Amino acid sequence: MNKKLLFFKKTAALLLCAVLLLPCSACFNSPEAKNPGNDTGQITDSPHSETRNEAFNDYVNRLFTETVTTDTITLHSYMEHPSDFGIDNYEVTLGRYDLAGLDNTSDITGKLTALKSFDRTTLSPKQQITYDELLIYLQNELEYSDLFLFQTSLCTTTGFHVQFPLILAEYTFEEEKDVKEYLALLEDSDGYFQSLADYEALRSRNGYFMEDALATQIVGECENFIESAGSPDSYLITTFDEKLDALTGISDADKAAYKTANQAAVTGHLIKGYRILTDGLKKLTGTNRYQGGLCNYPDGEKYFRYLLNHSLGWSKSVDEYNTLLDSYIRSNLLTMQTLMAKDSSLSSQFNNFSFSITEPAAVLTDLKTKIAADFPQGPDVSYDIKYITEALQDSVSPAMYFLPQLDNLNINSIYINPKGTRSSQLYPTLAHEGYPGHLYQTTYFADSDPDLIRYLIAPDGYVEGWATYCELFSYSYADTGTPLLNTLAQANYATILCLYAKCDLGINALGWTESDVTSYIADFGFTDKNVAHEMYLSMVSNPGNYCKYVLGWIGFSELKKEARAQTGSAFSNPDFHKYILDMGSVPFDMLFDRLEDWCSVQSAQ
C-alpha cells in the first residue's frame, strides 16, 4: 500500500485469487527452515552447494520481514502469530502512498546490490531458485521504474475498493490482539483512502487518470458499499460479531464494548474513507487526457510490456504472444470441427452440455478423487465454501480463493458469487479455485518449505495460468459418458479464453477501439454489442488481466508440448505436473530453462 509494496505487488488487495469474468462464455514456515539443506526434487546441473547458505537465508528472510510489516493487513494476511516469525515490533497501519518518493529507485537498486553480493554457486539448489526468481523480479522492476504513475489499485471488479471489504470480513480473530488491531485498522481507513485519493490526483495532474466511464463505474461500486455498510445488519457488523463471540477469554462486557467500537469505526472511518475516495474521483472525472488502451498513452505500450513481463516472466514479444493466441484459436477451432465431423450428434449434445455435479462440497470431493490419477498428492487441508454478500455480488468476480496464513494452512476460504457463477459451470470454477487449482497449488507449494520471500514475488501468470490450466483440464472429468463431447466443450471454452486475451492484447498494445473489438468477436459469432462494450471497458480498466490467465495457461501448455516431445513414451501427467509444482511459482523462463534437465532424468528412468 505504500511505496515499498508498490515494488512487491502483493498488497492486501492481491491476497486472493479470482476466476475470470467471461460475459460471453456459456500461501509456510517460520524463518528457520524445517529441513536445512534438504533440497531433494530440484533439477539442476549448475554448480551449487549441497547445504543451505545461512547468510542468504538471513537476507531473504529479512527482506520478507521488511516488506510484510509495511502495512498490517498484509502482515496479518500472511501470518497469525508474527512473533513466531521473529516479528515483534510493528506499527498497526494500512500504510500510505509516499507521494514525494515515488520516483526513488534506491530501494530497488539496494536490493539488487545486496542480492548480487552472493556467489550463486554457494547456494543450495532451492536457494538458487529463489535467487534467480528474485533477480528477474528486481531487474524487471528497475527497468520499468520510470512508469510508476501507470500503477493504480482502482479498477472495476478486482480493485482495492471492491476487495477490501472481503479482506476485512476474512480477517481472522484468534486472540484479543487481533480484535484490537482490526479496530485500529478500521480507524486508519479514512486516512488511507485520503492517501489513495491524493495519489489519484497526482496521476491526474500528470495525465494518467482513468476514463470517465471507468471513474463513474468505480464511484458507483463505492456508493453501493456505502449504502449497505452502514446498516445494523451489514456483513462487516455481523461477521465481526460472530468472530468475536467465538473468542474465549474475553468478558461479555469487553465484547460489548468491542462491538460498539466496531460499529463506530465502520460508520466513522471506513464509510468516511469510501466517501473521501468517491468525492475525490468525482472531482477528477473529466481530467483524463487519453482514451482507450494503454498504447494510447505516452509510454503506455512499454508499460503493457512491463505488465506481461511482471506476470509471466516469459521472453516473448507482444507480436509473439499475438501469434501464439492466433495459433491456439486456430487449433481449438480445428479440434471442434474435426470432432463434429467425426460425430455429427456432438453438435446437438453440446447445446445441452453441463457438469452433473452442482453442489460445491460434492464438486470439490469429486475433484479431489479424480485428480489423484493425474496430479501428485498434496497435503490434506480443510477449507470452507462461502458466498459473496449480496451487496458486493454485482461488483466482484464469479469466485475467489483467499490465500491462507503461513501458520494457518488449514484455514482456506473459497468464495462463490451466486450472480457470477451458474450451477452448471461450478465444476470448472472450483477446479480453478480449489482442486487442482489455487488451493491445491498454494498448499502444495507451502508444504515444500519455500523461502518466504517467494510468496511476495510469485508471478501472477504462473498462479492464474496454473488455475486456468486446471480449469480446462477439469473438462476431462465431466460425467457425460462421452469423452469426445468433453473435449469439444473444452476446446470451445479454450477458444473463448483466447478471444479475451486477444482483445486484451489488441486494446492495450495494438490500439484496438471498441468497434474493433465488436468486429473481431462478431467474426466468431458473438454479435451482442453490449458484450463487446463490457469487454472493452474491462480491459481498459485492468490491462493485462486476461493475458496473465490465458497466456499463463498457454505457457503451461507449451511446456507440456516440449516435455512430451523430449520424453516420448516416458511422459506422464503426474510427473509433469510434479515438475511444475515442485518448482513453485516462478517466471516461465525458469520453467523452460530447467525443463531439459528434468526431461533427461525422466527419459533415463
What residue ranges belong to the model's regions?
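Bacterial N-terminal signal peptides that target proteins for export
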Residues: 2-15
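Compositionally biased, low-complexity segments enriched in small residues
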Residues: 5-7, 36-40
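Hydrophobic core
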Residues: 16-21
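C-terminal motif of bacterial Sec signal peptides marking the signal peptidase cleavage site
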Residues: 22-26
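Bacterial signal peptide processing site
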Residues: 28-30
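Elongated, amphipathic alpha-helical interaction scaffolds
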Residues: 32-34
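N-terminal maturation segment of proteins
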Residues: 39-605
